[in-house]
Swiss-Prot record:
The active site is at D38 (nucleophile). Its EC number is 5.4.99.25. One of its GO terms (biological process) is tRNA pseudouridine synthesis. It catalyses: uridine(55) in tRNA = pseudouridine(55) in tRNA. Keywords: Isomerase, tRNA processing. Pfam families: TruB_C_2 (PF16198), TruB_N (PF01509). The lineage of its organism: Bacteria, Bacillati, Bacillota, Bacilli, Bacillales. This is tRNA pseudouridine synthase B. It comes from Bacillus thuringiensis (strain Al Hakam). GO terms for molecular function: RNA binding; tRNA pseudouridine(55) synthase activity. It is an enzyme of class 5 (isomerase). Responsible for synthesis of pseudouridine from uracil-55 in the psi GC loop of transfer RNAs. NCBIfam families: TruB. Disulfide bonds: none annotated.
């Protein structure tokens, strides 16, 4: 049993909760997720099973797309709807579509962002949420992120009321805190704000419409069709350039054999396959020997090579 499961993560569960539940359903210990989603967030959560856990790091660096909702009028401790109210300021004027689109445009491109106190970012060996739960606030490292697209989904021309909400879609780099973006939007518009709803609609090439629920996974287990829920390792890595080696080279892959970059591939990672179209390893460019590739992750062992 191996491959990537595209889970439609339900609301109220942490990513670790999802891994724990899937281990029980599949009766498989080797399971790991490819990036944390907050409990209140739903949507695409790729989970690696069996030998696929070896490729998890290559799936976490992908860009992510979200659709969500910002509410102006009050902020919270967690920057989302689950936290306690910190500041309230009624929206005492009409907010125009042009203003909202201007705020989104100002946050598009390469920007700096400070992670929220309620996050898993580590400072001095402790996670920020541990400080937050103890009532402490510490200096947080600013990180550089990229917002590839940030668009308003509502078709209204004006927004008004003591609190107002509007929907957005954002495509961003790994490590972006979308709830912090919601706070930053409020700052641009002059009001406290928080993220009132969020769903991840894409993680790299993986889309929400291709995800399955826990109920569907359990149904496949009961029907004996569990293999149908997996995306193969080969398919999950299909975005990387591919090299094919002969049988003799394949046997040496497991020992860390260097390969010549005969195809002059410039992409950072290259998948190496045998003639049976089985992915053996992921290679990268050798930092000291131009034109050579070195293994970054070997996916097969001695026994598997003999099959």
């Amino acid at each position: 049993m191996e491959g990537v499961v595209l889970l439609h993560k339900p609301k109220g569960m942490t990513s670790h909760d999802c891994v724990f539940k899937l281990r029980k359903i599949l009766r498989e210990k080797r399971i790991g997720h490819t990036g944390t989603l907050d409990p209140d967030v739903t949507g695409v959560l790729p989970i690696c099973v069996g030998r696929a856990t070896k490729i998890a790091q290559f799936l976490t660096s992908e860009t992510k797309t979200y659709e969500g909702e910002v509410t102006l009028g009050f902020s919270t401790t967690t920057e989302d709807a689950s936290g306690e109210v910190v500041e309230t300021k009624h929206v005492d004027r009409v907010i125009t579509r042009k203003e909202v689109e201007g705020a989104l445009a100002a946050l598009t491109g390469t920007i700096e962002q400070m992670p929220p106190m309620f996050s898993a970012v580590k400072v001095n060996g402790k996670k920020l949420y541990e400080y937050a739960r103890a009532g402490q606030e510490v200096e947080r490292p600013v990180r550089t992120i990229t917002i590839h697209e940030f668009v308003l989904l509502d078709d209204r021309e004006v927004f008004e009321g003591e609190t107002i909400s509007f929907r957005f879609r954002v495509t961003c780099s790994k490590g972006t805190y979308v709830r912090t973006l919601a706070v930053m939007i409020g700052e641009k518009l002059g009001f406290p704000s928080h993220m009132s709803h969020l769903v991840r609609t894409a993680s790299g090439e993986f889309l929400l419409e291709d995800c399955i629920s826990f109920e569907e996974i359990e149904e496949n287990v009961q029907n004996g069709t569990v293999e149908s829920i997996f995306i193969s390792i080969d398919e999950a890595l299909s975005k990387f350039p591919k090299m094919v080696v002969d049988e003799k080279q394949a046997e040496k892959i497991k020992n860390g054999m260097f390969l010549k970059n005969e195809l002059q591939i410039t992409a950072p990672f290259i998948t190496v396959f045998d003639k049976n179209d089985r992915c053996l390893a992921i290679y990268e460019h050798h930092p000291k020997h131009p034109g050579m590739l070195k293994p970054m992750k070997v996916l097969v062992n001695n026994q598997e090579l003999k099959l």
